[in-house]
Amino acid sequence: RSIKYRLTPRDVEKASPLPTEFINRYLIDDDDLAMDSNIVREAAIEAVGNETNLLRKMYNIRNYVYDKLSYGIKPHIDTPDIVLERGIGSCGEYVGVLLALCRLNGIACRTVGRYKCPPYAEQQGIPLQPDYNHVWLEFYIPGFGWLPMESNPDDVGRDGPHPTRYFM
């Protein structure tokens, strides 16, 4: 089975501010996130609207990205501005967009993963090729810690509502 998180927006209403070291490490553009581009900055504003609750902001950003992008594997990873214009991205490109939008909204986050997986889920006992990596992200809630979030929905249930199972 798996670990399930039962955190609600009410649980984080009184979360402490981010520690300074988190601001300096997890709210910066340290991975070609195009956080200074107009399209990414506008998407960051549009994604959260007037929401102030950290967990609801995270849901809003996730839903925005899941609704704006369709999944597609590419041989290389483009920057979030290009991905938002194109509307199609791999899991790594979804992560880039999510990182940029979260960080611009004051949510500390980081990339996790890069593990190898088979080209088809039912295949086992085969050599894994570098073409099949997977990445997702973790976001930080003061007082609770790092929470994982799936990078993309594989276009399951496109246009939402997106199930909360994507917070692993």
Model features per residue range: what roles?
Residues 52, 82-89, 93, 124, ...:
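A short glycine-/small-residue-rich loop at the edge of a beta-strand within enzyme catalytic domains
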Residues 1-85:
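Acidic low-complexity segments
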Residues 2-3, 91, 113-117:
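Generic short beta-strand segments
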